């Protein structure tokens, strides 16, 4: 690697590359979430028969992973670059390796391994066959072929590629701490994110109001159900995301027991499943508008029989 790309140049390079592969460039979704997979641009679009190719950066919050800015690679909030392609291209791994070349990483000169790591997200009823991608001993990407999302079997199968941008940038720039990553020329990652990292860690572990969070969870759950009763999928899913983040804050605070934890996850999962079913029904009612005419006619005719 000759030129060391800045963090924002890595993002721009990946955006241009996946745009060239036919992906729409979406923007980060404006609700807290623990992973790019939970964005409606993945969770909702991975289900149902319609094609979907998208790429986007997703800031991902994991309160329990906060370390007050003292750990060089463990963060309350990190950034993922998410690629979802449905149906999955047969050459998705080759496309991924070519993306690394665009970043200046020649696969022939590095030890790149696909290590089996099947994926599951219990809180959304989602699972798939997966691999971690290791670059010279460091995990930089998660590869997943979704088999189930929101409790529904996926058909066609969606391929998801999730780059860990901080890890990738640390490798490309040869720095040991994420806070030393150059975000833009002359501006370090730590100059932007170190103080927020400390403050969010302090809040998550020491300051959050447990009673308020417990009350909020109940309210968000009820509001999601109320929206679903009216067939309002997207507002309902927003409240599912709020439930998830509220639970993560409670979990980080140590406010839920092991038994209660399983119960909260089940409650979020039940909502996510209803959202998924309602979304597919909504798309069907619209006539699956992203399908080509021939496939749409066949599917709708089958359902009418």
UniProtKB/Swiss-Prot annotation:
Entries under InterPro entries matching the protein: aa-tRNA-synth_II/BPL/LPL, Gly-tRNA-synth_heterodimer, Gly-tRNA_ligase_asu
GO biological process, one term: glycyl-tRNA aminoacylation
GO cellular component: cytosol
Class of the enzyme per the UniProt entry, highest EC level: ligase
UniProt keyword list: Aminoacyl-tRNA synthetase, ATP-binding, Cytoplasm, Ligase, Nucleotide-binding, Protein biosynthesis
GO molecular function terms attached to this record: ATP binding; catalytic activity, acting on a protein; glycine-tRNA ligase activity; transferase activity
EC number(s) reported in the record: 6.1.1.14
Catalytic activity: tRNA(Gly) + glycine + ATP = glycyl-tRNA(Gly) + AMP + diphosphate
Compartments it resides in: Cytoplasm
Pfam family, one: tRNA-synt_2e
Protein family membership: Belongs to the class-II aminoacyl-tRNA synthetase family.
PANTHER family: GLYCINE--TRNA LIGASE, CHLOROPLASTIC_MITOCHONDRIAL 2, GLYCYL-TRNA SYNTHETASE
Subunit structure: Tetramer of two alpha and two beta subunits.
Protein name: Glycine--tRNA ligase alpha subunit
